């Protein structure tokens, strides 16, 4: 039996996205810009470089108000050209 994400979450809830992308200066700004469109707020994402320095991992936490917001952000963050993966 497959459990759906919206069955596990109670809204509003704190939800963290981990975005992996190329180690370019604009990565953090692009991630925050997309998040701001769907969950306006004051964000301080954390950035961790990969061991070889080719990629950065950007973690950003929002207060999600509904499942559609969570799903839309997964999709739009993944559509950023320099992003390789969103968890």
From Swiss-Prot:
Q: Which Pfam families match?
A: DUF493
Disulfides per UniProt: none
The cross-references to InterPro entries, in alphabetical order and at most eight, read: UPF0250_YbeD-like, YbeD-like_sf
Instruction: Give the GO cellular component terms, alphabetically.
Output: cytosol
Database matches in SUPFAM superfamilies: YbeD/HP0495-like (SSF117991)
Domain of life of the organism in this record?
Answer: Bacteria
What HAMAP family does this protein map onto?
Answer: UPF0250
Family, according to the entry, reads as follows: Belongs to the UPF0250 family.
Q: What is this protein called?
A: UPF0250 protein Ent638_1166
Native organism is Enterobacter sp. (strain 638)
Q: What's the source species' lineage?
A: Bacteria, Pseudomonadati, Pseudomonadota, Gammaproteobacteria, Enterobacterales
